[in-house]
Amino acid sequence: ISGSKNASLPILAATLLFDKPVVIKNLPRVRDINTMLNLLKSLGSKIILSRDKKTAKIINKKNMKTYASYALVKTMRGSILVLGPLISKYHKSKTSLPGGCLIGARPVNYHLTALKKLGMKFELKDGYILAKSKGKLTGTTINFPKISVGATENSIIAASLAKGKTVLKNCAIEPEIKDLTNFLNKAGAKIKWTGRVCKIEGVNSLNETEYSVMADRIEAGTFCVAATLAKGNLQIKNLNPNIIGTEIKLLKKVGAKIK
């Protein structure tokens, strides 16, 4: 099973927080991952890919750029995830809205509202978010009006280096988000979960680390369904079965034998 694209994108964005090298393993070979790696390169990161392109070593320069151009951002909604780490680490960012002027800020309004509560000031101009903060972001309590995966991820990443404690309420709790927090915690962040509440105690910096991205649960579930329909035998490797627990229960109900 391939690594999860939806877990890889926020983890790659979060590498912008690091002064020290980071190694991310089990990346899927899909276009959005290449786009995110190219976006990191454009910001100043040095990317060293393994021969199979599933492992990336990321080394950030001391003076990183903070401009995420429309040319790179337009093809991938997940590129808005660089806004949180850029404003948290470098206190400024010029990030294109996904889709530019045509779509506007509505798809990312929960991101902007949450980051504003952490201390980001911004204006929208010509399809770009022009953002800055006076020094470090400051921990606060944020209650998301609706559950948003991207806004939860951006807020967690940004709050990891903020001053003091941040409490995020009504968070999305998909396994990919838990994978992001596992990665950050492995690097020294202080993030705890209680249901849909995420508590983050800001730290000054993150440590050099290696991390393997979780398996793609959509791909795993698809293979399981296909094997059940075909009445065939299938062995799945590189998978924590807990991430497709619901699918396994349903397949067992229709007669699949899974162990």
Spell out what each predicted region is.
Residues 1-259:
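Short, structured segments at the rim of ligand-binding sites
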